[in-house]
Amino acid sequence: MDNRKRAVIIGMVLGDGYIQVRERPRKTMKPYVEKAMRVLHGPTQRQYCEFKAKRLSWALGGKKINVTKVKNGPGGNYDAYQFTVNHPYFGQVRRWMYPGGEKRYTEKVLNMLNPEGIAYWYLDDGSARRNIDKDGWVTSVSTEISTMCSEQEAMLIADWFKAEYGIEWKIRRDKRKSPDRAFYIACNTSNTHEFAAVVGPYVPDCMKYKLSHVAQVKSHERQAPVGECTSCGKTLYAKRQRGLCSTCYSKDLRAMR
């Protein structure tokens, strides 16, 4: 498999794709080993799921992949879209990415990525933050990838991005998680611009909102109001906790201490 096709697969597995290798019984013949990738997305990302199925089909030499609607979540109460595809190559991919049975970030795997693969990784696991001042102006932005890994792995990822693309990521920790699953990466406004330049050409139209924070900080346009403070009635330009403006929220915090 050539490097471009492999990078597409690696990026999808780093994101929401899951590879399972298991033995399946057959009544009249010897059991066979199933090597399958499953991708699942919520109802609002149907187009994205279909887009990924087409790109994976290309990577696998035109293998037909059908996206189906399924029930998901507790009690099967939620709609979702998924595809599952079997291919012998997934056995090798699993050995690279699931040493010991769990997904790990290694230099070998990272070196298999290209900008398109990174784009799928970000579209699945990435998010954006916007700092909006009291008058509705976006003053800065940041980009995060929820790697949720060990500190050592997060440092490896950050060092790799710096060496390969000149993009600087900071290591962040979610203290609610165990140390081996607590760390993720984030970059500031200037590095967000650099990152968007790398992945932007590979982001489908249905997922452009994942880079909207870059456009907002570039446009120098005031954001539209999203509501009013439930305490003082001040106009809000971003959703705040408990529907309060920053001043009222701070007052509430001090009152509770």
Model-derived segments and spans:
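Short metal-binding segments enriched for Cys and/or His
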Residues: 251-257
